[in-house]
Amino acid sequence: MAELAGYVWLVVVGAFVAFGFGWGTGANDVANAFGTSVGSKTLTLRQAVIIASIFEFAGALLLGRVSTNTIASGIADITSFTREPEVYAYGMVCALGVGTIWLIITSYYGLNVSSTHTIIGGIIGFALVWDGGDAVMWAKRDPGSFPPYKGVISIVLSWFISPLLTAAVAALIFFIVRTCVLRQRNAYTLAFWTLPPFVLITVFINMFFVFTKGAKKTLSRDSNWSDSKAAWISVIVAVCAALLCICVALPLLKKMADRHFDHNGNRITPIVPRGDYNIHPEEPLSSWQKFKKAATHGVDVDIHNIVKTDDKIGDIHDAAEKFEERVEYAFSYLQVFSAICVIFAHGAGEVGYMAGPLATIWDVYQKGQLSKNVTPPVWIILICAVGLVIGLATYGYNVTQAMGVKLAKLTPTRGFAAELSTALVIMIASQYGLPTSSSQCITGAIIGVGLLEGAKGVNWNQFLKQFASWVSTLLVIGLAVAAVFSQGVYAPSKIQGKEVIMYEDRVANLTTGIYKDFNANLQSYKSNSDALLLPTLPPTTWADLNTTVTSAATKTKNLVDPKVTQTTDVDQILGSLYQSLSLLQNYTIFTLGQSTVFPGAQACIDPAVANSSTAACRSPTLLPKELMK
């Protein structure tokens, strides 16, 4: 049975908002990953959804079920939640719920934000409410990373480091491809020579990233596993992929290219036979057809139409340098392969961490504590992965259009340079502790290839909106989660109310029992006190004690009687307990000792029979007999 069975609602609500967050991530973060491929017309939205369905699931289920630290590590000090882990779980529910709404809003406006930063912003929000500014790790020294700080400062730095690094790398890669291949007279032949090396590099980067990040925790159970071993295995896999490309992929690609293009590189237009055209009246759609049309709307949107309707975007695309279409066609298959690697690595490296909030909620519910490491169950991975795919399929077109069409002109060669540079920068940065974000990296990469067309090759208005959305994510999410979390933690709670009443009743009953036992002992000393045989317990002291005990017992009983007192302060309950313990400490034979109370006699026995009695005086008890077993 779960330790916190009363909080099963957190798991239920958490599962729903986790699915919603996965949906929002699919519409925003995963759509961003496919933006270059769809924007360059290498893939259609429908094809991107199919690839995501297969390889996102494969990466998540095969290599994504890693044992992760709580997602707050490095951002917030969660030790303040250890006494009340259910509050932390509630905070995660708030973060997922608000994060879902934020991802929907930003997706609507075509703004690409980081889903990880969204959750982190939520954690910052409820941590501040719970324990103030000290609960957040703003800038903590970490000699193992560069810059040598971790915490919120690393996120701020990623806004600048991520796009700048990938812009430089993407520009360099595309510059080399453009100079050495695209602008050469024999570009088509050179393209086939360059494809195997690019396949080798692409596979190595993505496999090394998967082995060192996505699957590291699983593979590290082998005591011989290390990053150097991961590098060698990645090299072997990459070489095999390159050989497979040479032996199988290139001949097939050459055959397909020759089928679509003539020897001069012009696309062969199929001849459409002329005939009679009959116009038929359009049949009304059935209910099923209407439902199908609505369900598939997200993959049928023409994201490239904006090039015709928006003059500024149209000018950017028209001004971009055009290359031989046949060469771009050859690179399109390399970009498809790169997109598959990217989405598989995303499933292996990101889905496991995305599942962190719901996994934490489930772990708290099961164990009643905050664990250092949490391994997401399969059902949690499935919830997140299904949400990702559905989000991409139903609402990913806005961000895909923004990243793949609005920001800069993309072609298969440009898109491949952007994807490869993103994977390369993330891999290198993760090894050296540089703060990066995949969302911000791909944005910088697209800008990098666009800048090779000059400053007018980039839609700077779109980029400024992007940058503003990165900055506002932490602020907006933090404030919104803080508001929702505050409403919950400062509102009356049925579950905690029952627990408080239980504690109050038990403490009050314990205190009343002590008073009752004390009073019984006090009555047994009355005759000796009246006879002035007890120097430490004269009649006046006995009377005062009797009055005090009787009054205190009645008062304690009334504290938990709703007919008398409806609201009880904790100090009143504990004050009564402390008073009873004080009386025991100062006025019982535990403290005074038998000989001090009445030397040579049983002080609690009537003097008339004291000489003939051997019975011992009763000793006061602190706990009821049923609790002493």
Each predicted region: which residue ranges?
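Alpha-helical transmembrane segments and immediately membrane-proximal extracytoplasmic
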Residues: 1-629
